[in-house]
Amino acid sequence: MATAIRFALALAWRLSQADRDMKITDVLRAEHAVFHNLFDHIETAVPKLKTMAEVKVLAAAVEKVHAPHSKTEDDLFIEPLEPYFDQMGQQETFHDEHEQIEAALNAVQKARTLKEAKKILLNAITASRQHFDKEERIVFPMAERILKAKTLSELGEQWLCRRQVGK
């Protein structure tokens, strides 16, 4: 957790520097660091939870922060890379994975038993971790090789505008 906090502080400092460009890959890695800390907490907390309401609140919290992250990735990041994903036969993979994670988080709200809700939530967390790992190992490095630094920075600026960070 301390590593993620240091990373988030470093990100905040970089965002405060008007003369520095923030690449979209830097932004997404920072968001992933925060998610991993949230996931660590959920994986520890869920087995101890005693009510459906507790599980549902955690799932809703993850969904609330995951949805804009997924939309940002799809709109600003995956879209410019789609021709390359198409060549690899992976054009729909990342969109589909985002939708599957969102569907799993929504399914927690419809679970009929505490055991089922816990299982669905933990499976959604596992799927998210696997998805993030694929992005961090394959997609982000590929983007940094394929896209120009200026493009990555412009996409980072678009993220700032969407999130209204620093305004």
Provide a role label for each language-model segment.
Residues 4-167:
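Small-residue-biased structural context
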